[in-house]
């Protein structure tokens, strides 16, 4: 078996102990702090003693797909090409989901590990990530969302519902993430993969603020699984795809800037196109509203004038040109618009008001996408070695840290 592999200009040592990398979707660090203070996360609380607790930056836009793919490639979107959940395909002139592996431009560490002879397992909450994370992977790969369809030929394992002892959970529930952890425990106990990647859903974080009973119960559930993985001798590495913030005014009303309506009023209809890369099939909990948008200019709308107009709107944190955004956030130039707009911490960006169904927002809006959701945890159940001055850490450094720098 190969002991060292090279993927996207980085080298990884193959682990001799089961290694579990966990992406906790929407894990604003305050959730962990509050759960620990409430006595709901004793294992995480103990990690300051025998493990490592750090902070890193996620990829901007701070959305699910770009960050999960950055984690499993060890590289930013400029390398792997996935810069949102949704993008405007210039060739077809259509807005499309980036769930298809044909949009992926780089190999994953997961697939390369499997090629090197390791048993690799991937369990995701939502099926939207399965094709991307499992691209060219010869191993185990399935989603909790479609656990009833898991079979040996396609997914590398079978009878997962019976093994886990849970029914197929609702996609809008905490149970969807718990199924991921329970499935991971079953795989660790039975197949004992060399490397496992677990990715959850941020349904709870969209609905419940840090320190609420629902949030603390969710983190207590995760904490119990982290402890069991640890007790079975696994290396456990935990990070997030993005943080989460309230996007409301002082009395809980959504703070929304409908950019398409504002641009249409300024320049006329059909002269600009606002695209929201947070858009995906699961919009009940966020209404396709996030703090990052990209804008395409048409019919000779002056770029400088559009920048000044957008930057002058209260709630807009920054407006960047395509080249500025690509340089700052390491994005692929052919998959973003002429401008990138970032909302302030308490503000989300929409397109046109009549394009968003907010009926599912039964609690004050919480969302992500901007730089205010960039800080994420980097947590390990072992001490880091050989990294005296690590400098800026990213969530997509986690596999390198887990395989190359843990005692």
From Swiss-Prot:
Q: What is its EC number?
A: 3.11.1.2
Where, in this chain's numbering, is Zn(2+) 2 bound? Answer: 202, 206, 368
- Write the protein's name: Phosphonoacetate hydrolase
S-S bridge residues: none
Job of this protein: Specifically hydrolyzes phosphonoacetate. Does not have activity on other organophosphonates or acetates.
| Induction, per UniProt | By phosphonoacetate.
Cofactor binding description? Binds 2 Zn(2+) ions per subunit.
One GO biological process term: phosphonoacetate metabolic process
Q: Which organism is it from?
A: Pseudomonas fluorescens
Which Gene Ontology MF annotations are present?
A: metal ion binding; phosphonoacetate hydrolase activity
